[in-house]
A protein has these predicted regions:
Chain A
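Transmembrane alpha-helical segments of polytopic membrane transport and secretion proteins
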Residues: 1-50, 145-147, 330-340
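A structural signal for multi-pass alpha-helical bundles of membrane permease subunits
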Residues: 42-340
C-alpha cells in the first residue's frame, strides 16, 4: 500500500515534528537502497507535486545566485564576458580577483550615501504608508453610506500597474508645464523643481511610493480589523472606555500579528522598489535618489561600460543586508513573545 | 433575526434613558454630526488623491498634442492619440508580447504553485521544511542579486529577447508567494474531503484535481491575480532582457514615448490608458476575493 501520510492541516502547520518523523527512514546508518525505495514509494506523490517548483527555483534562483556570487569575485564587464557578435562567439576572459570589488565598494562614500538614503526611503515609506493605511482602514471599518464607493476609489492605485501610475505622476510633477506647478503659479507661488532638486526629488519619490502602497495596507488592515470580535468593543464600552482607549487597547493589539507581517513584507518590497525610482528620476539628480537596487541596475545595464562584476557585488551586499534585517526582525519579535 | 433582536433591545434602552431625562445617548456605532462630517471629509480627500493621477491620465489622453498640459478637464476632444498609438507605433506588438508572457506565467504559475501548496498542506515528506523555508526566503530576494547572473545565463543560452526567458523569470517571482498562499488556503479545506475521496478510490492526484481544486476557486483567483499583476507590471527584468523595438513588453514600450530624446506625453497617456484598462478589469474581478485571501495568507505566514 503506497499511501502517503495525510496530515491534518494543523499538524502540517507544525511542520517540524512531521518532517522529522518522516525523515526517519533515511537517517538510519547507511540508508541503503531498500530504505530509499521505501521512502520513494511512500512520498512520490508529494515529491511529484513539488517537483516543478523545486526545479524552477533551483534553475532560476539557486544557480544564478551561485553564479552571481562568483561574478562578484571577478572583474567581469561588458568587454570581457562571453558574447556573440554575428556568428563568432567570443569566450569569456574575465578573471577571479577575490574580494577586491567588495573592498572598493565598502571603501567608497557612494555606497554609504546610497545606503543612508535607502534606509531613510524605506523607513519613511513604510511608516507613512502604514499610518495612512491603518487610519483609513479604521474609518472604513464601520457602517455608513458610500462605504463601498470609498473603498473602490481608495484601492484604485493598486489596480493600475505601477509603471503606468509613475508616468502619470511624472506628468503632474513636470517642471515646466506639469499640473502641480501650474496650480502653484496660478496662486503666484514659484514653481518647484519637483524632480531636479535633490530634496524635492526625494520627497516626490516617497510621495509616489506611499500613494502606490496605501491600498495594500488598507486592505490588509481592514481584514485584520474585521477579525476583531465586536464583543470586545461592547465590553470596553460598558466599562466606560473612551474611543482612544478602545483604539489603544483593543484595536492595536488586535491588528498586531497582521501588522507584523505586512510591515515586514512592505519593508522588503520598499527596500527593493525599483520601478518608482527608475522611472521617476532614474536615480537623479546626480544620484541623489538612487537606492541600492537602482544603483546595481544602473551599473550593469545603463552605465557605460557596463560593469557586471560590481553590480553583482552590490546585489550580494543588498541580499546580505536583507538577511540581516529579517533575522533581527525575527529576534525582536521573539523577544516580545510573538510566535512567528 | 438575531440582529433584529439586538437592534430592538438597543432601541428600548435608549428610550428608557431618554424617559429618565438624561441627555440622549448615541446608539453603538452611531456618530455625532461633527464626527460624521470629519469622516466623510477625510475619506473624500483621500479618495480624490487616490483617483486623481489616473483620472488625469485618462482626460489628458483625449486632448490633442498642443493641449496636453492645459489645466482644463476637456479641451479639443480627440481620439487621435489612440489612433496614432495603435496604428503608427509598435504598441500592438508590445501588447501581444505582454499578453503571451502574462498568460503563460499565470497559467503555469497557478498550476505549479497549487500542486506545491497542496503537497505542503496535506503531506509530510522529507524535504518539506527546507522547501517551506526556501519559499519564504526567495520572497525577499532582491532582483538586484539575480539580474546580472540571469542576464549572462540568458545571453549564453540565447534566451534574451525571447518571451520564454521572461516567463521563467517571472515564475520565480510569483511562485514562492503563490505557493505559500495556496498552502494557507488548502489548510482551510477540511481533510475529511480528501479522505472520503481516497476511500472512494481516487489517487492523491485525483483528489487534488477533482475534489480540492474546484473548492479552491477563491484561492486560485487570488494567486492568478498576483501572477498577472507581477508579470503585467514588472519593469526591471523586462527593461534589461528585452531590447529592440519589436521585442519590448508594455513596461518597456511605455518608456519609449518619454525619454531623453522624445517627449510624446500625449501618446504616452493614450498608451498608459490602454495598458491600465485590462489590469483594472482583472483587478475588479479578483478584488472580491482579495481581502480574505490576503488575510488568510498574512496571518498564517
Amino acid at each position: 500500500m503506497t499511501s502517503p501520510t495525510i496530515a491534518s492541516p494543523g499538524e502540517a502547520e507544525a511542520g517540524a515534528t512531521g518532517a522529522e518523523r518522516a525523515r526517519g527512514p533515511r537517517r538510519g546508518a547507511g540508508g541503503g537502497p531498500g530504505r530509499l525505495r521505501l521512502a520513494l514509494s511512500t512520498h512520490w506523490y508529494a515529491w511529484a507535486m513539488i517537483a516543478p517548483v523545486v526545479l524552477v527555483i533551483t534553475a532560476i534562483i539557486g544557480w544564478p545566485l551561485v553564479r552571481g556570487v562568483y561574478l562578484s569575485l571577478t572583474d567581469a564587464d561588458e568587454a570581457n564576458v562571453e558574447r556573440t557578435i554575428g556568428v563568432n562567439s567570443i569566450p569569456a576572459t574575465y578573471e577571479f580577483i577575490g574580494l577586491d570589488n567588495y573592498v572598493d565598494i565598502l571603501g567608497d562614500d557612494a555606497f554609504w550615501d546610497r545606503l543612508g538614503w535607502t534606509v531613510v526611503w524605506t523607513v519613511a515609506c513604510v511608516a507613512i504608508t502604514f499610518a495612512i493605511g491603518l487610519t483609513l482602514a479604521n474609518m472604513l471599518n464601520r457602517q455608513f453610506r458610500g462605504r463601498t464607493a470609498y473603498r473602490m476609489a481608495l484601492i484604485l492605485p493598486w489596480a493600475i500597474p505601477a509603471f503606468v501610475s509613475v508616468f502619470a505622476w511624472r506628468m503632474l510633477y513636470n517642471e515646466r508645464n506639469g499640473l502641480l506647478n501650474s496650480l502653484l503659479e496660478g496662486r503666484g507661488i514659484d514653481g518647484i523643481a519637483w524632480l531636479s532638486d535633490p530634496t524635492w526629488a526625494k520627497a516626490a519619490v516617497i510621495a509616489v511610493n506611499v500613494w502606490l502602497g496605501v491600498p495594500f495596507m488598507l486592505i490588509a488592515m481592514l481584514g485584520a480589523l474585521q477579525s476583531i470580535p465586536a464583543e470586545q468593543y461592547e465590553a470596553a464600552e460598558m466599562d466606560g472606555a473612551s474611543a482612544w482607549q478602545r483604539f489603544r487597547f483593543i484595536t492595536l493589539p488586535g491588528v498586531r500579528s497582521v501588522s507584523m507581517t505586512v510591515v515586514l513584507l512592505s519593508t522588503i518590497w520598499t527596500f527593493n522598489m525599483f520601478p518608482v525610482i527608475f522611472l521617476l528620476t532614474r536615480g537623479g539628480p546626480a544620484g541623489s535618489t538612487d537606492i541600492l537596487v537602482t544603483e546595481a541596475f544602473r551599473l550593469a545595464f545603463t552605465a557605460s561600460p557596463r560593469d557586471f562584476a560590481n553590480s553583482a557585488a552590490w546585489g550580494v551586499l543588498i541580499l546580505l543586508l536583507l538577511v540581516l534585517f529579517a533575522i533581527s526582525y525575527r529576534r525582536a519579535l521573539r523577544k516580545q513573545g510573538e510566535v512567528w | 433575526m438575531a440582529t433584529d433582536d439586538t437592534t430592538r433591545a438597543t432601541t428600548t434602552t435608549t428610550t428608557v434613558t431618554r424617559r429618565r431625562g438624561a441627555p440622549r445617548q448615541r446608539r453603538r456605532g452611531e456618530r455625532s454630526r461633527a464626527a460624521s462630517i470629519g469622516l466623510h471629509a477625510t475619506l473624500l480627500v483621500a479618495a480624490a488623491i487616490a483617483v486623481f493621477p489616473p483620472l488625469w491620465l485618462l482626460v489628458t489622453s483625449f486632448k490633442p498634442k498642443t493641449d496636453t498640459f492645459t489645466r482644463s478637464l476637456v479641451s479639443g476632444f480627440t481620439l487621435d492619440n489612440y489612433d496614432h498609438v495603435i496604428n503608427d507605433t509598435e504598441f500592438l506588438t508590445w501588447f501581444g508580447n505582454s499578453v503571451v508572457i502574462v498568460l503563460a506565467t499565470t497559467v503555469i504559475g497557478v498550476f505549479i504553485s497549487s500542486t506545491t501548496g497542496y503537497a505542503l498542506s496535506r503531506f509530510r515528506f522529507p524535504g518539506m521544511r527546507p522547501l517551506m523555508w526556501t519559499l519564504l526566503l526567495t520572497q525577499m530576494f532582491p532582483m538586484a542579486v539575480l539580474i546580472v547572473p540571469l542576464y549572462n545565463l540568458m545571453s549564453r543560452y540565447g534566451l534574451l529577447n525571447q518571451p520564454v526567458g521572461l516567463v521563467v523569470t517571472y515564475l520565480t517571482i510569483a511562485v514562492p508567494f503563490c505557493a505559500w498562499m495556496m498552502k494557507s488556503f488548502f489548510d482551510t479545506i477540511p481533510v475529511a474531503i480528501d479522505e472520503s475521496g481516497r476511500v472512494d478510490g481516487l489517487n492523491p492526484f485525483g483528489v487534488f484535481w477533482r475534489l480540492i481544486m474546484p473548492l479552491a476557486k477563491p484561492g486560485l483567483a487570488v494567486t492568478a491575480f498576483y501572477s498577472f499583476v507581477t508579470a503585467w507590471a514588472e519593469v526591471a527584468f523586462a527593461t534589461a532582457f528585452m531590447t529592440g523595438e519589436r521585442n519590448l513588453t508594455l513596461a518597456g514600450g511605455l518608456q519609449t514615448f518619454v525619454n531623453q530624446h522624445t517627449q510624446d506625453w500625449h501618446l504616452m497617456t493614450a498608451a498608459a490608458v490602454l495598458i491600465a484598462v485590462p489590469a483594472i478589469l482583472v483587478f475588479g474581478y479578483a478584488q472580491r476575493h482579495l481581502q480574505s485571501g490576503l488575510t488568510a495568507g498574512a496571518t498564517k505566514a
